[in-house]
């Protein structure tokens, strides 16, 4: 028989060693015996015994031989028995180096798994490609060390329980040796259920829950466990490419960010928190880790996605399905919390959406703290000296789901997930080209930095802990936003939405977009490759054409030159793309509105400017992320630095403010923020004669009706603000202003709030008129240039 390759770590050095051989076939035992013969030849004075390691679910009788080998009296003296070294050994089988994508899929078929070949296949491999067989040894441990660990960590007392503990430790050591050869992407937690159920810590917590049983906890662990397999890991990239086949096959990464994250993951476990715009995000993160040969992530997902064949397959590739609405189930909450803690303690990486659900508006939602609090508990309990919160920005040139999101905005119901839904989803990915997927990894946030050292003060102060969690989560989300590149899709959609259905030519699109690109360059904001191409007319044409055919732009070719516009029915879809870039223009838009407000203010206009900037920040805090108030003021001051002696000119007011705004490039507030204040104003109008404690559903229904009336009357500029999604945050604003609760002066305050919003919309009109004057002047200059030619 041809000799297989042996791992460099598979060398025995102790004087008395018990080799635990994990084998499935006689072929594997032959290979291990051959390897053991080499060890004996190298160390003729050492004692090597070999015992077949019982399988995981073996009956108690199968452990008898191991129990005897572990008994102190089995060796020549009790002390020498305790000093005996235990070394687990296994044969691993590597897949063919030239395996195709089809071969990875075929591995799901019975008898085609390259990692677990049949005995007949093993003999053929040894004849034709013996290097595919590797004898590996796990880390050794003395019997005394294992016995101490067993006593310290488990509730068991019987010698057979100790043998089971040693067996589990052997399998875990072999798993670590295996992924060192296969690669970090195959790293996964093993034997989670038996390890946790045997844990003294876990049992102690279980005893504190009334009516809780080990059996029920075990069933919940079965539900949570991933059942990881190498074949499923290989399929992650295949399925990921299938689900995203409408996009460029190569994801767009920042290689410096990837290198920094690789170094960070070598030092600490991490939670990868990704922005969530599409179901595709769930495959983007695992594929991104595989692309860059990084350790895998164990993704949390709703149990509603565990259907058909996809459920088992996704479990085996690292998906952890969790139940919804677990507040009334203390046992499930406890098991989930301990499961998260166990995975973190074993230095495996977790991942979920920081927003908790897909953002159907295109902008980031507030972070959810549920799972984060479990990770924080694990950290504060000392299960890791630090845990990194690694943000992941995922953005797309286009998404087919925007049609669905537009329907939600108009009041449609969510489509339930299932096999038919999955088929239609994957089918839609291949209907056209959606551009690129951009994945960014901003600098990670340290849990230690925000929560202090483990076992610190926060463990005894729930309120302080929650505040620290909120600040930490917002910092992660803020870093995600700062790393998210601005796309051509977002810029073109934002521009065309401002025309309210009026078409623009290629030249008009091109020259108007340049101010935005100049601003992004000055701010050194990240931009996508598609946005960089907007510097050329060809790049603008490509971006506009990619959005054409109602996706969501309409192109008209019947005249002298093509023109592009957004039809009213497509405004909600286009808004998704526009909203995805607002973060890059948020503060400069607030500057414009604060200047417009100061123009009409009495008294100290500089003070009025700052007061209005902070007021706008407060009103928009439910829709957007902001820097803290000190940093925000500094950012606003920096935005104003483009105008020399701006405070002096602002103090003069009148035409000076007109000139300041006319000189500002670009003017973005109307394009970026108007629709949100129109939605707020619709809700404020509904509240004028609504009951004090009106419910959210009734308020939304009334706002939809009134909003449609306002559209018909031209009292709002488009149908875009008539959106259930925008009304949801508008209600939050009203609650924050204490306008949905009984009070003596409620009616007066509701009227005053509506008046305030109308004044802000008046400021939008003022800025919009100046922006229109800029556009006309630019058009006139461009025509003069063309006429001279």
From Swiss-Prot:
Misc remark: Was identified as a high-confidence drug target.
PANTHER family: DIHYDROXYACETONE PHOSPHATE ACYLTRANSFERASE (PTHR12563:SF17), GLYCEROL-3-PHOSPHATE ACYLTRANSFERASE (PTHR12563)
EC number of this enzyme: 2.3.1.15
Membrane topology: Peripheral membrane protein
Written domain comment of the UniProt record: The HXXXXD motif is essential for acyltransferase activity and may constitute the binding site for the phosphate moiety of the glycerol-3-phosphate.
Residue span of motif HXXXXD motif: 276-281
A biological process term (GO) from this entry: CDP-diacylglycerol biosynthetic process
Keywords for the protein's UniProt record, in alphabetical order: Acyltransferase, Cell membrane, Lipid biosynthesis, Lipid metabolism, Membrane, Phospholipid biosynthesis, Phospholipid metabolism, Transferase
GO molecular-function term, one example from the UniProt record: glycerol-3-phosphate O-acyltransferase activity
SUPFAM superfamilies xref list: Glycerol-3-phosphate (1)-acyltransferase (SSF69593)
Pfam family name, one: GPAT_C
Full protein name: Glycerol-3-phosphate acyltransferase
Pathway, per record: Phospholipid metabolism; CDP-diacylglycerol biosynthesis; CDP-diacylglycerol from sn-glycerol 3-phosphate: step 1/3
Presence of the UniProt keyword DNA repair in the record: no
InterPro entries assigned to the protein according to its UniProt record, in alphabetical order: GPAT/DHAPAT (IPR022284), GPAT/DHAPAT_C (IPR045520), GPAT/DHAPAT_LPLAT (IPR041728), GPAT_PlsB (IPR028354), Plipid/glycerol_acylTrfase (IPR002123)
NCBIfam families: PRK03355.1 (NF002886)
